[in-house]
């Protein structure tokens, strides 16, 4: 089979030929039909400081994908051969204090597909059976491939007291920020403001936002106060940008909620008393997806048609054109890029 792998501690990935793996006890073999490139995959491609500290080549990359169950290992009762599945990328231990208290999304021993073990940029991949989410067979594979990152957006929007009837600021209009705008709109939030300095991506938020803000052209805090009269009740932070985090926190009304998924590339400084404590701000750190609550919430939105993820899929390319695909995403002129492992 063909697979896209990190073979050496250096920039880039390589298209390789490997034997089709066999599922062991509790595992399934998935025939991958669609895979999506994530920002994490770009870090692995670039071989930046994070990748150098985490990735151990050789490794087949990719953690956003969908496919069909081709075979099952001993002891597997579900899913069954022929099922259409999306994959939860976090493989958890079930034994640590986080898992034993139901917080599987912050398992202390998490292994991530395409990061810590072989992932889905391949024609076939073996995964734990418990990591498969079975979809209706009429759900397009390319949409099924991005249910995993969609779960990050759902987790962020529904954390804390939710967003229904509340004013919301979304900082960062990357794929997950755009997905969050969709979820917030479908969940009764309003007004919704979306801020991002990339005009291409910001435009994708137009159907779901009451106000778009390019912080390079407008004063974000001034716009927030003009639209809301005082500030927003909820901040959904996806950028990881230090300035955006500071502005987002100060855009909150006293007593507001900050839900932060974006990860800064370096440690940041902020005024704990002035930005958080004395204003009574409740902050939530968002990691992954709650298993399996987030999947149930997210698929309910997608299966019912309340959220349509397909407009975010801007490019579809064969796996053989992976260099072009990664270049598109790195350019900022794409949202979700889908790879077809069979082509």
Swiss-Prot record:
Gene3D superfamilies according to UniProt: Medium-chain alcohol dehydrogenases, catalytic domain (3.90.180.10), NAD(P)-binding Rossmann-like Domain (3.40.50.720)
Catalytic reaction(s) noted: L-threonine + NAD(+) = (2S)-2-amino-3-oxobutanoate + NADH + H(+)
Listed GO CC annotations: cytoplasm
Pathway annotation: Amino-acid degradation; L-threonine degradation via oxydo-reductase pathway; glycine from L-threonine: step 1/2
Site description Important for catalytic activity for the proton relay mechanism but does not participate directly in the coordination of zinc atom, residues in chain: 148
Annotated Zn(2+) 2 binding sites: 93, 96, 99, 107
GO biological process, one term: L-threonine catabolic process to glycine
Residues reported in the UniProt entry to bind NAD(+): 176, 196, 201, 261-263, 286-288
InterPro entries: ADH-like_C (IPR013149), ADH-like_N (IPR013154), ADH_Zn_CS (IPR002328), GroES-like_sf (IPR011032), L-Threonine_3-DHase (IPR004627), NAD(P)-bd_dom_sf (IPR036291), PKS_ER (IPR020843), Zn_alcohol_dh (IPR050129)
Location of the protein in the cell: Cytoplasm
Entry's EC annotation: 1.1.1.103
Keywords of the record: Cytoplasm, Metal-binding, NAD, Oxidoreductase, Zinc
Family membership: Belongs to the zinc-containing alcohol dehydrogenase family.
Subunit structure: Homotetramer.
UniProt-recorded name of the protein: L-threonine 3-dehydrogenase
Gene that this polypeptide is encoded by: tdh
């Amino acid at each position: 089979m063909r697979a896209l792998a990190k073979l050496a501690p250096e920039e880039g990935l390589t298209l390789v030929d490997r034997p089709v793996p066999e599922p062991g006890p509790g595992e399934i073999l998935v025939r991958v039909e669609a895979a999506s490139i994530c920002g994490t995959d770009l870090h692995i491609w670039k071989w930046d400081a994070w990748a150098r500290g985490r990735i151990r080549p050789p490794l087949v990359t990719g953690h956003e994908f969908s496919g069909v169950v081709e075979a099952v290992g001993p002891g597997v009762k579900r899913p069954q051969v022929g099922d259409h599945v999306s994959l939860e990328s976090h493989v958890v231990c079930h034994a640590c204090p986080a898992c034993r208290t139901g917080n599987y999304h912050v398992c202390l021993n998490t292994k991530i597909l395409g990061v810590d073990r072989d992932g889905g940029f391949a024609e076939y991949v073996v995964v734990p059976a418990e990591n498969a989410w079975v979809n209706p067979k009429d759900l397009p594979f390319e949409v099924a491939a991005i249910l995993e990152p969609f779960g990050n957006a759902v987790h962020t929007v529904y954390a804390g007291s939710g967003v229904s009837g509340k004013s919301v600021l979304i900082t960062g209009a990357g794929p997950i920020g755009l997905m969050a705008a969709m979820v917030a709109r479908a969940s009764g939030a309003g007004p919704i403001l979306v801020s991002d300095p990339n005009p291409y991506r910001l435009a994708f938020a137009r159907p779901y936002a009451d106000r778009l803000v390019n912080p390079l052209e407008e004063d974000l805090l001034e716009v927030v106060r003009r639209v809301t009269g005082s500030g927003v009740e909820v901040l959904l932070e996806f950028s990881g940008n230090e300035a955006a985090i500071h502005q987002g926190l100060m855009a909150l009304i006293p007593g507001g909620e900050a839900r932060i998924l974006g990860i800064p590339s370096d440690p940041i400084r902020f005024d704990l008393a002035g930005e958080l404590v004395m204003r009574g701000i409740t902050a939530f750190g968002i990691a992954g997806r709650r298993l399996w609550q987030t999947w149930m919430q997210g698929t309910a939105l997608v299966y019912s048609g309340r959220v349509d993820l397909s407009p975010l899929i801007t490019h579809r390319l064969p796996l053989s054109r992976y260099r072009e695909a990664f270049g598109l995403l790195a350019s900022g002129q794409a949202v979700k890029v889908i790879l077809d492992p069979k082509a």
